[in-house]
Each structure stands twice: as structure tokens, then as C-alpha cells.
């Protein structure tokens, strides 16, 4: 047994020698509440000055821990899609899946260059630091048992820490559209340590931690590196929360994850509380009384719903649901009904502003999750079961007067004629100058799809592409001399769909009678 252990440790040492060696980070013991139940042995060994043994005891504690749960992954039923398996295998060769818009994925070199920027699209650089291939590598490891995935993950994790140091910069520079005069190490911080990306890692690393924890490559030294780095992430967000919008929501929800998943940190209660307080506040700041999210973008409206729901999920799993009041749930339900109303019969959404197109598969999955939260809502149940259970709303057309979304339909079925119009108030960054735009569904097809988001931001040609696709004249609305709308502050003055329908039907009936035509000839 001793010989086998020595061989394993030697193999790991040979592996890490190709990159940065793992180090024992003794400062981790000052970050943890060593009086937390289960850490008694860790505390005793640390007080005796035996930090290496304390780190081993800490790893034993985490491997045996069962009182903390996350709804994101079921370790008893780990599955991996063909696409995820490809990301995992490509990741071994440093070909990293970063962005669906840039395929095939780029290779970042044998000695990973975390600053490689092959196309000057900011998202390509930002999303590299979300490490989307890490969780698939963890799934591949758990399913196959092949240690190569765990070894490579540990190597890349340490490599990222060493090559992406956090240096101080002005908070507002994280959100600049173009890097301007910011260069070198500070420019890299702008991408690697933007709070949104940091929060993404906070959330995803809870799953990665669980997936790789049994591996011999997950050494006591690595554990201390991991925990110190994780702590640094949470502290960074706490000091650099975004001012508003979906970024703030994402960051808050993920701080709840951090505080709930690692309650052993001294600051964990403060992390969790900060996230809960922000979501409880922002759900009323960012969501209008009609259920519309104030960025007026269907994609980010959907994202906001799922952010609020994920917070409830981690709360339910760990026993703190009571920290979210009833009006929090009521607002989520109104947001879901808003989204259901503006969606088309095939479950897709209008691509207003920076929206992206959803798929039916994705949306049925969402409705199923939402139906568990709101089992009494028959409409949500209807969409979750594709009409097998539940019931459709008892109306056709619907106006969301504050958000400025208006839906006209004669049916909820695939044969419907449905028009969705956007004419809302002033919104935020993702809202394009597209007031008056519409999409028209007829008999199973979207005849007037809007352009949605082509690209967000970047340098040179990328920014030119962004600006071209944002133009008012590119949307399904009116303009003058191809100029952009200078303001998007529409106000609803009148919404009487039923009265209008009655008036139109009355005129049609009178005309039919005068011309002696059967009134049932048309509907």
C-alpha cells in the first residue's frame, strides 16, 4: 500500500512539474471557522503547527461531508452529453470551448496563453475565463474513472491562478466596451476578473469541486490552493458588485451559492446574506408590476427568471427558503406568465433587443422546473407537459402596459396568427433602439423574425458589426432617413383589445348583412 501511494504521488509530482507545482497555502486556516462542526481535528493539528496534516484532515472532512447540497449536480447519476464529452476531450489538448459563435474552438497552446484573443470580440476573451470545459471534464472523470481528466483539470486550475493575478483597477473599467488605453496586466484583469466571470466560476466550481474531490490529483495542497482562490473570488465580488441589471442578479445569486456551499468560511454568512438581500431588493427594482424585466429583452428576462429560481433551489436544498418572502415568489410567477404570453406556439421567443433564440427542448425543461415551484398554475403545467395536463390562459391577446409588450393572437395553437409588438419605456444596455418592432407568426411560421443580437462588443470590425445590427432600420419598425430612434420612451395610452375586436366584428357583420353574405364565412 505504501509503495502504491508513493507511485501515485510520484506520478502526480511528475505531472505538476510540467507546469506550476501545487503549494500548501497555510493562510487558508485563518479564512476558515475552525470551530465549525467537523473541523475539530483540523483545528487541533493547525494549533500544533502541523499544517500539512491539518490540510490532509481538511480534505478528509470534505470527502466525508454530507450536510451541504447543491441542486446543480446529482453525484449518484452523473450524465454527459456527446457535446460535453467533446469539450472535455478537447480540453485535454488545450482546445477550449469558449463560445458557440466561434467554432471550431481555438487552441490556446501547450503552455496555455490565457491572454490569447484570436478575434477581437470581448465575449470571446471574457468567456474564456468561465472555463466551460471544466465541468464536462469532471463529468468525464466521474463516468470513466480516467485520472487524466482530473490531472489536467488540477493543472489548468493552478495554471490559471498563476497566470491571472488580481491587480487593483477601477471598478468601472470592468464594463468598458473597448479596452482603450488599458494594456498589459491590467487589461488582462479586466477580462479575467470581471465580476460576472468571477461569479460564474464561483457557481460552477461548486460542481467541479464535488466531481473531482475523490481524485488522487485533488491533493491536500491543491485543496488549500482551491479554497484560498475561491475565497479571493467571493471577496472580489463583494467589493465590486455591478451597479444594476442582469450582471448584478447573476453575481448576487452566485454569492448565495458560495456562502451556502462553503459554510466553513468565516465570511460565508455575510456572502449569503449579501446575495439574498440584493435579490430581494432587485426583484422589485428590475421587474415591472406587469412581470416584465426592465432590460426589455426576452433573453435576459428568461435569464432573470432562472436566476431568481436558482436562488430558491439552493435555499431549498440547504434549509433557508424562509429568507425569501412570498412576494418574491409572486413576482417570479408573473415573470413566467409574461414570458409564456410573448412566446410563440413552438416555444420560441421574439428576438427583440439583444435577445437570442431559445429552443423548445430548453423551454420545456424550464417549464417543468417552474411547474415544481408553482404546481397550482395550470398554464405553466400546460406548457411543461406540452398540453397533456393543465390549461391554457382564458384569454387570447394580452398587453403588458408598463413594459410595453403587446400580444395579439387568435389561437394558442401552431395554426395561430400571432403578433408581438415592442413599444416600451427607456431601458438599459441590452435594449436596442427598436421601439415599434414586431414579429408575426402565421400558420406555423415566424414570417417577420427580428435580428436580435449579432455580437455585443469588441474592437474595430467587431464593434462595427455590433452597431450595424443595432440600427433602427435593421428592425421591423419605422424610421426616417435610416436614422436611429433618439429615444425609446413609449407610454401606453390605450389598450382595449376586446373592444377593438368587437368593433371590427360588428363592422364586418353589418357589411355582410348589407351584401347578404353569410357572417360565418369568415372569423
Residue spans for each PLM region:
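Non-catalytic C-terminal accessory modules of carbohydrate-active enzymes
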Residues: 394-523
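Bacterial Sec-dependent N-terminal signal peptides
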Residues: 1-23
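Short, ordered beta-strand-loop transition motifs
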Residues: 99-102, 106-109, 119, 189, ...
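Extreme N-terminal leader/anchor segments
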Residues: 22-99
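Short alpha-helical segments and helix-capping/turn motifs at coil-helix boundaries
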Residues: 27, 40-41, 118-119, 187-188, ...
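Short, solvent-exposed helix-helix connector turns and helix-capping sites enriched
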Residues: 50-51, 84, 146, 360, ...
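Aromatic-lined, polymer-binding surfaces characteristic
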Residues: 105-115, 120-333
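Carbohydrate-active enzyme catalytic cores, enriched for enzymes
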Residues: 288, 292-448, 507
